[in-house]
Every structure is written in structure tokens, then in C-alpha cells.
């Protein structure tokens, strides 16, 4: 068994398993209010003081912080880091937003296609959500009878992911991510 640096060079490190468990926690946690309404919380909330979803999201952010720091350390230049973070986030986000607004929305809306595509909210859903601030979760006529009539409820996390990118970048610029400074900052 190698040290952490050696284990991270391969994909044999169980992070995918941890991500799968965290995703399952979020799925279970969200199933209660999505199927039964906002007042319904998962049964373990009273015993744990945190939902499984909260624990899953916390786990995702911890893993992200670890890998984002690793990305900064492996980047040849600061520009490489910024470009890598942009390319990690925005192409996938754009695809999700376009598919949601232009495929899922038209297939499941209660409106006519003309009314759906004429609504300003469809275009704002794409352009506004690319800004990652004040996320718009609803599309016109889509899932209106659901306890939560939105789509892509997890988009809110991306704003905090970008804040984490900025924090790692700032810590790297001031030298807190170098091996010697890491020890002095945390001890």
C-alpha cells in the first residue's frame, strides 16, 4: 500500500465509491420532500441532526476541495488552473441547461410549444443560470403539479464550487498550498 500521493496517481483510490454513496444519500434525502411535499423530511433527520442529503453534499464538497487543490498543484501555470476549472464546469453546464430548456421542457410542459418557446423564462433559464447566481429552477408549464415544480435543483451547488475554485486559487497565489507553508498554516 502506497502513500496518498502514490494512490492518487491511479484511479484505484475509492473516491468513485465514496461519490456513489454520497449521491445515494442525496437521492434518498430528496425523495421525501419531492414525493411527499416540503414538510416531509427523512426519518433519520431527528436522530442525526443532519439529513443524508446534507451529509452527501458535505462529502461532495470535501472531495471537491481535495481534487481542486490537487488540480492547482498539478497545473503548470495559474492560467492553466483557471482554464481547467472553466472547462470542467461550463461545457457540461451548458449542455445540461440546453437539454433541460430545449428537450425536457418542450417534451413535458403543459403549454403549447409556441407558448413555451415564446416565454422569456426559457431563454433566461439558460443565460441566467450560466451566471451561477440567483439560479432559476422553473421552466414554464413544467412539473407544475409536483411538490417542487423545478428542474435541476442541484445547480445551486455550482456557485459554491466556483467560490471554492477562487479560494484555492487565492491560497495558491499567496503560497499556502506549497508543502512547507501547508504545515505552518494548519499547525
Language-model features: locations:
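Short, Lys/Arg-rich, polar N-terminal cytosolic tail immediately upstream
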Residues: 1-12
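Juxtamembrane transmembrane-helix termini
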Residues: 2, 56-87, 92-115
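Functionally critical transmembrane alpha-helices in membrane proteins and complexes, commonly lining
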Residues: 12-72, 90-93
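Structural signal for membrane-spanning alpha-helices in multi-pass inner-membrane proteins
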Residues: 30-33, 100, 104, 172
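Transmembrane helix-loop junctions in multipass membrane proteins, especially transporters and channels
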Residues: 35-42, 74-75, 105-113, 177-181
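Membrane-interface helix-loop-helix regions
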Residues: 48-54, 90, 94-162, 166
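Solvent-exposed interhelical
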Residues: 162-187
Amino acid at each position: 500500500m502506497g502513500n496518498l500521493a502514490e494512490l492518487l496517481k491511479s484511479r484505484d483510490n475509492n473516491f468513485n465509491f465514496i461519490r456513489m454513496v454520497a449521491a445515494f444519500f442525496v437521492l434518498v434525502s430528496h425523495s421525501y420532500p419531492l414525493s411527499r411535499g416540503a414538510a416531509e423530511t427523512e426519518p433519520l433527520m431527528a436522530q442525526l441532526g443532519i439529513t443524508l442529503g446534507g451529509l452527501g453534499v458535505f462529502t461532495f464538497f470535501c472531495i471537491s476541495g481535495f481534487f481542486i487543490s490537487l488540480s492547482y498543484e498539478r497545473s503548470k501555470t495559474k492560467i492553466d488552473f483557471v482554464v481547467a476549472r472553466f472547462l470542467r464546469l461550463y461545457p457540461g453546464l451548458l449542455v445540461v441547461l440546453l437539454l433541460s430548456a430545449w428537450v425536457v421542457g418542450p417534451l413535458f410542459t403543459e403549454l403549447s410549444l409556441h407558448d413555451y418557446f415564446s416565454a422569456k423564462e426559457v431563454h433566461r433559464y439558460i443565460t441566467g443560470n450560466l451566471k451561477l447566481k440567483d439560479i432559476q429552477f422553473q421552466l414554464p408549464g413544467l412539473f407544475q403539479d409536483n411538490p417542487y415544480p423545478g428542474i435541476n435543483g442541484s445547480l445551486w451547488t455550482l456557485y459554491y464550487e466556483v467560490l471554492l475554485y477562487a479560494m484555492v486559487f487565492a491560497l495558491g497565489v499567496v503560497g499556502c498550498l506549497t508543502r512547507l507553508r501547508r504545515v505552518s498554516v494548519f499547525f
